[in-house]
A protein has these predicted regions:
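Short beta-strand elements
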Residues: 260-276
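Intrinsically disordered, low-complexity Pro/Gly/Ser/Thr-rich segments with frequent PxxP/GP/PP motifs
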Residues: 206-208, 213-246, 252-258, 263
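Generic detector of intrinsically disordered, low-complexity, polar/charged segments
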Residues: 141-145, 157, 244, 264, ...
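Extended substrate-binding grooves/exosites of carbohydrate-active enzymes
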Residues: 1-189, 198-204, 209-218
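A short, hydrophobic secondary-structure junction motif
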Residues: 94-95, 255, 274-276
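A generic structural signal for beta-strand entry/edge sites
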Residues: 189-191, 248
């Protein structure tokens, strides 16, 4: 309780704090339940989270949400079919170590079919590595064991969607960005269905561009005007005719910022869809 109070007093005035956590990977029990009650009694405006109750149901009321680590999509479906009394989140999922995040779409697609599934939190955001120079003076991203320490977990700290050091996006970031985009462009031979999953903004606040490529080379581009209201969809004709000459053709419909934002410059791509 003293630890819970210390965290509460430190963070209570931060607007970014939405949920209080009772800890991590610590099973369950009365003391942790009392922590959750402290948060509720002291701050009824925020939710309380604890994953450990999925291993110890004696104090199921500890957490305001069902929280599990790395469940399969089928396991989530099976659980919600039996008990949907709480919203379900993955407090950790799609472990971003090495060449990973490839099946992430199975989880993001689930949000469209399971109303109680609330998504998850990727483990984790940035590689926990630091710059070190090799014997030739060249810098590299060092991890466990690179400093002669033993025992060590070696590269297990390198599991982010962004690289350590300068925070460059890793290839995994592209997969994450696509699955999290708030506009879906379902492109076919002659049409594109634009699904606007944004809660508040129309797609007309973005520039929409269609690009036709043959064998990887741009053949033509065109500007498209879209105006899809939040949480709705609309189908548009593509500005290209169907090509007859042999080759591999791709049609990409993308959405871009019209003006600079605090987080990205004008022209930044926020969503795309492609047909081959």
């Amino acid at each position: 309780l003293d630890r819970a109070n210390s965290m509460y007093q430190r963070d209570k005035n931060h607007a970014a704090i939405l949920i209080w956590s009772c800890g991590n990977e610590s099973f369950g029990g009365k003391d942790i339940f009392e922590m959750s009650q402290f948060f509720r009694n002291t701050d009824p405006t925020r939710l309380v989270h604890y994953e450990g109750v999925c291993h110890d149901r004696r104090y199921n009321a500890t957490s305001d949400m069902e929280s599990q680590m790395y469940p399969s999509v089928e396991a989530i479906k099976d659980f919600l079919a039996k008990d949907d009394s709480k919203p379900f989140i993955c407090c950790e999922y799609t472990h971003a170590m090495g060449n990973s995040c490839g099946a992430m779409h199975k989880y993001t697609d689930l949000t469209g079919t399971e109303p109680k599934y609330q998504g998850g939190f990727i483990w984790d955001y940035i590689d926990q590595s630091i710059y070190k120079k090799d014997r030739y003076g060249k810098e590299f991203q060092a991890y466990g064991g690179d400093f002669g320490e033993r025992p060590t977990d070696y590269n297990f700290s390198g599991n982010g969607i962004a690289y350590g050091g300068n925070r460059d996006a890793s290839p995994k970031m592209q997969e994450v960005k696509f699955n999290y985009q708030n506009i879906t462009a379902q492109v076919k031979e002659e049409t594109v269905k634009v699904i606007n999953k944004n809660l508040f903004v129309n797609t007309n606040i973005f520039d929409c561009k269609a690009t036709l490529q043959k064998d990887g080379k741009v053949v033509r581009t065109a500007v498209m005007e879209t105006a899809v209201e939040p949480l709705s969809q609309k189908e548009y004709a593509l500005p290209f005719k169907k090509e007859e000459k042999a080759g591999e053709y791709t049609v990409t419909v993308s959405f871009h910022l019209k003006e600079d934002k605090p987080w990205a410059k004008a022209g930044h791509e926020v969503a795309f869809g492609q047909y081959v």
